[in-house]
Amino acid sequence: MSEITHRKKRLSSFKLIVLGFASVIVLGALILMMPFSSTAGVVTPFHEALFTSTSAVCVTGLVVQDTGSYWSAFGQTVILLMIQIGGLGVVTVAAFFAMLSGRKISLMQRSTMQDAISAPKVGGIVRLTRFIVRGTFLIELIGMIVMLPTFCGKFGIKGIWMAAFHSISAFCNAGFDILGTAENKYPSLTGYIGEPTINIAIMLLIIVGGIGFLTWDDIYTNKWHFKKYRMQSKVILVTTAILIIAPAVFFFFCDFMGLPLGERILASLFQSVTPRTAGFNTADLPAMTGSSKAIMILLMLVGGSPGSTAGGMKTTTFAVLILSAFSVCRKKDDAEVYGRRIDGSTVKNAATVAVMYFLLFFIGGIVISTAEGLPLSTCLYETASAVGTVGLTLGITPQLGILSQLILIVLMYLGRVGGLTLVYAAISNKNQSVAKLPLEKITVG
């Protein structure tokens, strides 16, 4: 017993997080395989159940079966629970239940909780976890109440379940919808393109869920005093605003020409918000221009913010790389923002994460394109959606073969935990050698 305990203690935080996600995915897949999880009462093939489970836990939204028509009420509930666990994080959920039971949280557990939500320090982590969980449920409840009249007006009493499901799915940046029928599969929110309440509610839920729990805490503590926010919170909020407004303006002038002005504004904003990293869509994505799809791919790869329900390489990674490039152009040794320097190791970690995401995105797209005989651009859209844990699709995912689906499963999983794992691997267990190799310059650019 002592040896088992010793081994558990040796597991680093990032390994616990990675194994926690994997455990929930496998358990969810086994449950979804059961006949009572599908409306037809049949056993779902393991690879399809695994794909759905991975997509839910990694809060992606890519599916191989229509969620609304294929899965039973029980199956949809299981998917929703996995979305909630995946959005909050396995460690955060486990820690919250431990606190509810009155158990004392050890220092090692607090350290793991700190890593799971990207907190700057261990102190106050229990208070922060309570704040996150309570805030999550409150925001999801508000989102549900706002959407209730619209969904109940169309679906009657079933509208309560519809509002709850889509509120949680939006806040957790999952992108799963249950609006599909046997006659109209995979509709997402295309039927609500001109409905202001649903559009605005979903967009706000996505944004709030995607800015990160620490940013919430900063806003809650300092209210609207922007100057008092942490540098990270400032960078997140400004970067998020830029990555919403700039693409929305581009989409407005390049797409949706046939829509009335109000719907065109809503459609442009919605398609700008959702690629980071929610996966809902109100517009016909294949009909959008090639340049708009390229911008959406970039947005999908960037994703949300650290310590949030969103995936992707993160807004801070993107911002650090841009700031670093500006510092080079200005012939400065360090990247600077809001009167602070950004540490060189942070820039290296950002570059490492960005390279990893781009390699996964590109290699995955090439393999799927080769295996399926599909255009590379279409396959790259799907792999960006998978590795960014977004869920947007040009409609090819349900038709892909098992090999291609397995590739997307791996991309979704690595997209959710891969960047985190690489960063922790880079900053932990460093072997500082006294002797160093000779330095030699290499020309770049």
What are these regions (language model features)?
Residues M1-G445:
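Membrane-proximal intracellular helices of multi-pass ion channels
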